[in-house]
Amino acid sequence: MKVKEIREMSTEEIKAKVAELKEELFNLRFQLAVNNLENTARIREVRRAIAQCKTVIRERELKAQGEVKA
């Protein structure tokens, strides 16, 4: 998922996506623990997607407070 796509989503949609990604990350970590995970790079991708979503949410919070200068 690209940041541009995330920015087009509403804040509620982003929060729902974060919850979905966290659940996927939990499942991936479980699979890794039982040696059943084939694509270990997916863990990194999911963690990065969560971080990108949270960053966009935080940017919106700061913008609403008027603290973003850019």
From Swiss-Prot:
Belongs to the universal ribosomal protein uL29 family. InterPro entries: Ribosomal_protein_uL29 (IPR050063), Ribosomal_uL29 (IPR001854), Ribosomal_uL29_sf (IPR036049). One of its GO terms (biological process) is translation. Keywords: Ribonucleoprotein, Ribosomal protein. One of its GO terms (molecular function) is structural constituent of ribosome. This is Large ribosomal subunit protein uL29. It comes from the Bacteria. Pfam families: Ribosomal_L29. NCBIfam families: L29 (TIGR00012). GO terms for cellular component: cytosolic large ribosomal subunit.
